[in-house]
A protein has these predicted regions:
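Unchanged
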Residues: 29-115
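Class I (Rossmann-like) S-adenosyl-L-methionine-dependent methyltransferase catalytic domain
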Residues: 3-5, 60, 64, 70, ...
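Charged phosphate-binding loop/patch that engages nucleotide di/tri-phosphates or the phosphate backbone
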Residues: 105, 111-138
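Short acidic/polar alpha-helix capping motifs at helix-coil junctions
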Residues: 4-7, 25-26, 46-48, 68, ...
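Phenylalanine-focused residue identity feature
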Residues: 2, 24, 57, 76-77, ...
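N-terminal strand-loop-strand
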Residues: 1-24
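Charged/polar positions on well-ordered alpha helices
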Residues: 1-2, 41, 105, 121
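A contiguous, well-structured "functional interface" segment within a domain
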Residues: 1-8, 79, 134-138
Length: 138
């Protein structure tokens, strides 16, 4: 989740209540939902932020939380006009916006750090579109 206004180029991180690691909003697809609908819902539920999803950036992170269990998590590039957050206390113990160039040390897992690098590269490669208010003109 990116907040891109003027000089502010920030990424939203959440601290997961069950594990204490810093990462991104995520969750399970509900019956009848698309991946995009799931992403928008989970971001809103966990952070109180309304997201605009950019489907040009879609990354799948595969990991194994325990033996014989493999999970795929789909991430999209998302932006928001909302800077105020509110955390879903049962799942999220803290939320913070971080400057894009300072976020990597705060991200807990290697896979997530790689995801951040890819998302930042995507943003930099499309910066002019974002600066020209791409989403409000499409």
């Amino acid at each position: 989740m990116f907040y891109l206004k003027g000089e502010k180029e920030q990424i939203l991180l959440i601290k997961h209540a069950n594990s204490g690691h810093w990462s991104f909003p995520k969750g399970h697809v509900e019956a009848g939902e698309t991946e995009i609908q799931t992403a928008v819902r989970e971001i809103r539920e966990e952070t109180g932020v309304n997201a605009l999803i950019d489907t040009r950036f879609r990354e799948v992170v595969t990991y194994s939380p325990k033996k014989d269990v493999i999970k795929d998590v789909v991430y999209f590039f998302a932006t928001t006009e909302d800077y105020e957050t509110s955390n879903q206390e049962e799942e999220v113990s803290d939320i913070k916006w971080m400057d894009m160039d300072k976020v990597l040390p705060s991200v807990s897992y290697k896979n997530d750090k790689e995801l951040v690098k890819k998302a930042i590269n995507f943003y930099k490669n499309h910066r002019e579109e974002f600066e020209n208010d791409y989403y409000n003109n499409t």
